[in-house]
Amino acid sequence: MATIKDIANLAGVSHGTVSNVLNKKGNVSVQKINLVENAVRQLGFKPNAQAKQLKQGKTNRVAIIVPKLHIKRYGDLYAGVAFVLNDSDYDLTIYSTDDSGEKETKLVDTICAENPSALIVISASLQRIARYKDSMLFYVERRVSDPDAFFYAFDFERAGTELAESAVKNGRRKVAVFCGPARYSCNEDFVRGCISVLKNAGCRCSVFYSEESMCANTAFAIVSDDAAFDAVLVFGHENEEYVKTAHAYYNPASPLQIFTVTNKSMMHGFETSAYELNYKYLGCRIAQRILHKTSETEKECILPADGFLNPSEAPRRIAKREQINLLTLNSPTAYALKALAPSFAAKTGIALKIITMPYDELYKAALESRDSKAYDLIRLDMAWLTEIGGAIFLPIDLSSDPYKTISESFSTKIPRDYYYSDNKIVALPFDISAQMLYYRKDLFEDSLIRRSFFETTKRQLTLPKTYAEYDEIASFFTKSRNKKSPTDYGTSLVIGSSVTAACEFLPRYRSYGGRFYDDTGHIKVTDPLFRKTLIEHIKSAECIPKHTLNWWSEAMNEFASGNTAMTVVFCNHASAIMHYKNSEFVNKIGFSQVPGGFPLLGGGSIGISKNTVKLDAVREFFLWLYSDHTASMISYLGGYINNKKLLSDIDILSLYPWIAGVDAAMADGRRHDEVPNAAFNEYRFEKILGSSIRSALFGILDVDSAIAEAQKNLDAAFNR
């Protein structure tokens, strides 16, 4: 087996140099990194991470011990822990005890002998574990008497209470309660919650505890019981399947409703009686505690349940069939809505017709809708809402339902720009967005590339905080400037239209403190800072693809292809990365704040046309659109509807991790300036500014002529 000494001899470098390269320290030249890496490949060297960690006195191992591997909620727990630890130097392993206390004891002894960083246990023995040194110990779901350990679980008693309340509300009076052994606290708490409600309601009820190995037999005992139960309250997806199978075999014609406390799943819909517990998020919280990325100080953490899917605000079927027409931008969210529209029609009897248009056409159609009954709902770009929202939309009262309940699902970071026009609430946030920086993590973390960047620029390769740093990195990753660049271009610009060109320029200008109006409201772009920024912006365009990108989705496709190292794009178009065919970089994408810290807000809001007569149908559409389930489904499909619960949906965050950064981008971002000029119009301003910027970028006009043209047109539009 090759050793570090063998590598040093073959590479012709010192033992310390080999160690520095293997540990990815940035103090080694590119030449020596290449020598060491070539020697490693030739010798087939595999570093023994465990031996290294044991030498340090502690391994970066995290072990999860569960009763059964096939139980879905335990798989979710593992997935949640893995989601957080994936980007850390931790080795995560899951073990099964087969719900045997004896096997658990042996496993714990074996694992603790290797001194793991953390041990996560769903205990079969309920015996306190003698921890090894400073390992963190977490008991999950089943309480164990150990004041030194952490305990993470859900409020199982409340879950039982709410499950039983739902059964009673549905008219069930003969109820069976089915769960695992009573010795485990989760089952005991669940049964307590169920029984308290059922007895108070005068229901006939029986409790069926069962070992996992006997659950199928217990399910048959329930469906064949002389009590002829009309409902079963079940703890666990697997037990639900046992009951369904037993019922199908024994007496499929008899009425039996199953209410289940289960893991979170996108497959649950409004019709199901699934009460969700988010075990992936539970695992995520435990992993954050392991990494000390939480402010929690208590040893015990009881998380709230996700519960039923919008139990009181699910859409209902209306008396007569209707069609509502939605005018919106051609976007990922519109695409997702079209895919889900048949589901909405099936639930409510309301047909949803979605009319999509490009950006400029949508603006014109929205203006013309003042005198038209063609649309019941209109999606406006948030940059236009202040200007025309009050003229075309009905007011919305967020203090009364359903809008009060709907608004409670939104992030508190969403600014008023998505709601207000003429100081009245006339719209709800729809496909809200903000600019974010997307970058290739594999490039920014590569030790050879990092050293090459240092030798070229004399600074470390880190995420750009300023546009000067951004331009320097873009230049390094542009092949025409650096022949060894792994990408053809450092970045991209979307300059296919005047509005997109303005959106690319404004964050850079604002990051330097730029302002395009004076204290009197005079709109001006003739100051030296504007000229300096435009020259810099034109220079940065030397690091972008030669073909013109017309829209943000095209920039994301360019990025997903591996052709560019980084890009700044509105986040509601970022899903294009995941949907790009044959991308090798899907799991190598990072996101961050835009350089300079002044992202533009984007996306749109949705309002009710003043001319609609279908207010009941519109109400049901909003209930459906903003439900937790629909918001999740739209996000799965690549769109985005803001909902607080998305931040704990690990499946969605695994697909689209930048959703976790939307709140921060919203807090930092802006689109409007409070311009003291009554004639000012955001849409016209961006069109005028962007047109002149494009002329300068394409070499149609020199910088001074482009600025003069912009000022002339701005004067005509706003400074009369």
Task: Enumerate the predicted regions with their spans.
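Flexible loop/hinge segments that line or gate small-molecule binding clefts
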Residues: 122-161, 258-273
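Flexible loop/turn connectors
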Residues: 226-234, 238-321
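N-terminal helix-turn-helix/winged-helix DNA-binding helices
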Residues: 41-73, 77, 88, 113
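N-terminal helix-turn-helix DNA-binding module of bacterial transcription factors
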Residues: 1-58
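C-terminal capping/gating helix-and-loop segments adjacent to ligand/active sites or protein-protein/ligand interfaces
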Residues: 356, 420, 549, 660-718
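Glycine-centered hinge/linker elements that transmit conformational signals in sensory
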Residues: 471-476, 508, 512-550
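Extracytoplasmic/periplasmic substrate-recognition and gating elements
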Residues: 541-542, 580-646, 670-678, 691, ...
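Hinge/lid segment of periplasmic solute-binding proteins
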Residues: 382-436, 588-592, 655
